[in-house]
Amino acid sequence: MADQHRGVIGGGGYGDRGGQEQQEKQPFMMTALKTVTAATAGGSMLVLSGLILAGTVIALTVATPVLVIFSPVLVPAAIALALMAAGFVTSGGLGVAALSVFSWMYKYLTGKHPPGADQLDHAKARLASKARDIKEAAQHRIDQAQAS
């Protein structure tokens, strides 16, 4: 409250000369501070990226001969590991699929009406209808052949 009265009574608002000079210096100081902070952060990140690059080059220089010497062993081993991992993942996925199919069949056969049972019943009815139509058509042709 006292600050509000002082601003109104003392005239220390934005309209007088002293406040305007302070306002012009404020953005310059903030800009300078932001620039120094950005330069410091950018410079330190540049130094760190250079150190990481140098470390990577040194590590590759040391590791390349080792990889070349052991590549006849490492490459087939990596291929074998990849194939084994793919086999385990595939067998696990197929096992889960088989369990879900058996679960669905159990629910269907016990009458618990799992999702998709209506479609299966509809397809079964259509197949039975077509089979009946084919049987009747075949019986009709047999009767015609015997009559002539």
Swiss-Prot record:
List the residue ranges of the region (Disordered).
Answer: 1-21
Keyword presence, Acetylation: yes
Membrane spanning residue stretches: 43-63, 66-86, 87-107
Q: Which GO terms describe its biological process?
A: lipid storage; post-embryonic development; reproductive structure development
Main subcellular location of this protein, as a coarse class? other
Pfam families reported in the protein's UniProt record = Oleosin
Signal peptide extent: none
Q: Where is this region: Polar?
A: 2-34
**InterPro entries assigned to the protein according to its UniProt record, in alphabetical order:** Oleosin (IPR000136)
Entry membrane topology: Multi-pass membrane protein
User: Can you tell which superkingdom this protein's organism belongs to?
Assistant: Eukaryota
Chain positions with N-acetylalanine modification: A2
| Region called Hydrophobic, residue ranges | 35-106
Per UniProt, the ranges with Gly residues bias are 8-17
Q: Where is it located?
A: Lipid droplet; Membrane
Task: Give the matching PANTHER family.
Answer: OLEOSIN, OLEOSIN 18.5 KDA
Q: What does this protein do?
A: May have a structural role to stabilize the lipid body during desiccation of the seed by preventing coalescence of the oil. Probably interacts with both lipid and phospholipid moieties of lipid bodies. May also provide recognition signals for specific lipase anchorage in lipolysis during seedling growth.
Family designation: Belongs to the oleosin family.
What protein does this entry describe?
Oleosin 16 kDa
Question: Which species does this protein come from?
Answer: Oryza sativa subsp. japonica
The gene from which this protein is expressed is OLE16
